Curated annotation (Swiss-Prot):
Motif (Nudix box) on chain: 54-75
Lineage: Bacteria, Bacillati, Actinomycetota, Actinomycetes, Mycobacteriales
Domain Nudix hydrolase: 15-148
InterPro entries, per database record: His_Pase_superF_clade-1, His_PPase_superfam, Nudix_hydrolase, NUDIX_hydrolase-like_dom_sf, NUDIX_hydrolase_CS, NUDIX_hydrolase_dom
PANTHER family attached to this UniProt entry: 8-OXO-(D)GTP PHOSPHATASE, NUDIX HYDROLASE 23
SMART domains: PGAM (SM00855)
Protein name: 8-oxo-(d)GTP phosphatase
Binding site for Mg(2+) 1: 53, 73, 118
Annotated organism of origin: Mycobacterium tuberculosis (strain ATCC 25618 / H37Rv)
Record keywords: DNA damage, DNA repair, DNA replication, Hydrolase, Magnesium, Metal-binding
Its EC number(s): 3.6.1.69
Length: 317
């Protein structure tokens, strides 16, 4: 299910409150009973044990909100991985409506818990013990989904470049057509969203608009954008096998690569990859500025999640 980002709105059935959370995990310790441990938090207001989550703030996308809430509730920084489930349940306060919570797997990259008024305890438990500790059926369902695949997956981020006006209205070499005002805003908004997944390296098809989409992220990471001639629409159409091979070469590198390319490349690339590895991808409209979050285990694709954009205030599934 693709996540489409939009401002929260009132509906006839009541308001939808958008939230985001995670199964926060870390490698198991030497005396742990499992390969990974799960963070379970206690909220004194409700006297319950749950997974970390919270409302998505205006101006945030769900992934950015998830990482912020993890830090606020647990004290841990985290990199998101595969999306798990979207949970919806009714809420009565301060208005009647529903809360919609998007959950991800999230690996702790360090931090230290400090008790507070909202969360006063955090415990790390193996998956079976965490399952027994959680008070809510929806949290246990999320954890079950997490346990379906190995925790430690590799993430690959495939981005369609931002908006760049109309080809018909650009008089120069189309390969040099730049981002327009909205496209530049998309490029800036992509930075926190891609960092939420632990982006480390940046690749862009040999088009000005692809490079410009990645420039803010590359500046934030202090890395060079790798130019990729085989991933332009023309080159990929002439030799898709060469383009796919180049993507697989990129994936072999250590880290979380971000690959920015064009609209006629991405659908074929995602379809080929999913068919090769037996994965059902999200449905998507392949909009400019959108992102595919691909999760791999032992070199094989296990999930293909889509995020519709990075600009809007909240999310709609």
């Amino acid at each position: 299910m693709s996540i489409q980002n939009s401002s929260a709105r009132r509906r006839s059935a009541g308001r939808i409150v958008y939230a985001a959370g995670a199964v926060l995990w870390r490698p198991g310790s030497a005396d742990s009973e499992g390969p990974v441990e799960i963070a379970v938090i206690h909220r004194p207001r409700y006297d319950d044990w749950s997974l970390p989550k919270g409302k998505v703030d205006p101006g945030e996308t769900a992934p950015v909100g998830a990482v912020r809430e993890i830090l606020e509730e647990t004290g841990h920084r985290a990199n998101l991985g595969r999306r798990l489930l979207t949970v919806t349940y009714p809420t009565d306060s301060p208005f009647r409506g529903v809360k919609k919570v998007h959950y991800w797997a999230a690996r702790s990259t360090g931090g230290e818990f400090t008790p507070g008024s909202e969360v006063d305890e955090l415990i790390w438990l193996p998956v079976p013990d965490a399952m027994n500790k959680l008070d809510y059926a929806q949290d246990r369902k999320v954890l079950c989904r997490f346990a379906k695949h190995p925790a430690d997956t590799q993430t690959v981020l495939v981005v369609r470049h931002g908006t760049a006006g109309s080809k018909a209205h650009f008089s120069g070499d189309d390969s040099k057509r730049p981002l327009d005002k909205r496209g530049r805003a998309q490029a800036e908004a992509l930075v926190p969203q891609l960092l939420a997944f632990g982006a480390t390296d940046v690749y862009a098809a040999d088009r000005v608009r692809c490079h410009q989409t990645m420039e803010p992220l590359a500046a934030e990471l202090n890395v060079t954008i790798h130019n990729e001639p085989t991933l332009t629409e023309e080159s990929y159409a002439n030799n898709p096998k060469r383009g796919r091979h180049r993507v697989l070469q990129i994936v072999e590198q250590v880290g979380t690569p971000v690959i920015c390319t064009q609209g006629k490349v991405i659908p074929d690339l995602i379809t080929w990859w999913c068919e090769r590895d037996g994965v059902h991808p999200d449905k998507s409209r392949n909009r400019k500025g959108s992102t595919w979050v691909l999760s791999l285990s032992a070199g094989r694709l296990v999930t293909a999640d889509h995020i519709g954009g990075a600009l809007a205030a909240n999310v709609r599934a």
